[in-house]
Amino acid sequence: MVEKEEAGGGGGGGISEEEAAQYDRQIRLWGLEAQKRLRASRVLIVGMKGLGAEIAKNLILAGVKGLTMLDHEQVSPEDPGAQFLIQTGSVGRNRAEASLERAQNLNPMVDVKVDTEDVEKKPESFFTKFDAVCLTCCSRDVIIKVDQICHRNSIKFFTGDVFGYHGYTFANLGEHEFVEEKTKVAKVSQGVEDGPEAKRAKLDSSETTMVKKKVLFCPVKEALEVDWSGEKAKAALKRTAPDYFLLQVLLKFRTDKGRDPTSESYKEDAELLLQIRNDVFDSLGISPDLLPDDFVRYCFSEMAPVCAVVGGILAQEIVKALSQRDPPHNNFFFFDGMKGSGIVECLGPQ
């Protein structure tokens, strides 16, 4: 159903004729009010590797008001393999600065900025300038710290990463309200449902109604520290995606080594991953069999196709949260590139 609303050019939060033409497709898809909310939103993306570039591209094209790309690291020789915003010959430059020109060219109406400081050194006041914060390439401690800051200040929080064939996203939207478009169902008179086809009630796809809903999210710390000792948790263990436990292993590797597994040190890193898997699973009180040894073959480096999928999902969730349109993923999304499928998992306090 296309909402028949006029794009006002003056005050009252309207958008200009130029913006209405630029975002005509989005307005037809999710409505003028949702687009207005996007045009009033500022987003921070931390980590401008392959996944960060995909998220930035999608949000800039969607038409947020402003987007800040924060990264204190330099471009490595491997980065251009998945990071398409970086131009040739940029090795050694700051990753965010090297991404600015192509990012801004995607949509001149969006205010794209860069920040070259380390996110760990940013004060709480820095994050309050944004409506949504999305972390990539960050340590577990930084993820938890920034999530707590966002939670205190009612800022939409997202995080995600890509490890080889695997990727994940997580959202903490606090107490989130949204509207969902539902198709109206015509009332059926008693006995009519068994009558001739012509007399049966039909679903009119052009007749819809907007339903307001509310959902509550938990902090990332609680989602990562599930107690698997309870009977209810044990029953859910077999149904939980193995990628949740893979994430625990990879975040521990990142904390211990200060980097992600690399193909240059495959043998050493593979052995360390197996050891970390055993240690993490032992601390959780669960069997290592939940994550077979061959997982080490599929979690090295960023793969461009996986970045595209996970970045598309993560950007879509940010758009949904900012526009308050459609149900969000609560709270994890895991993508397995070997299977070519993804799953949404709600993990946290039982």
UniProtKB/Swiss-Prot annotation:
Broadly expressed, with highest levels in testis. The modification N-acetylmethionine is found at M1. SUPFAM superfamilies: Activating enzymes of the ubiquitin-like proteins (SSF69572). It comes from the Eukaryota. The keyword Cell division does not apply. The modification Phosphoserine is found at S16. CDD domains: Aos1_SUMO. Pathway: Protein modification; protein sumoylation. It is found in: Nucleus. Heterodimer of SAE1 and UBA2/SAE2. The heterodimer corresponds to the two domains that are encoded on a single polypeptide chain in ubiquitin-activating enzyme E1. Interacts with UBE2I. Belongs to the ubiquitin-activating E1 family. The heterodimer acts as an E1 ligase for SUMO1, SUMO2, SUMO3, and probably SUMO4. It mediates ATP-dependent activation of SUMO proteins followed by formation of a thioester bond between a SUMO protein and a conserved active site cysteine residue on UBA2/SAE2. This is SUMO-activating enzyme subunit 1. The gene is Sae1.
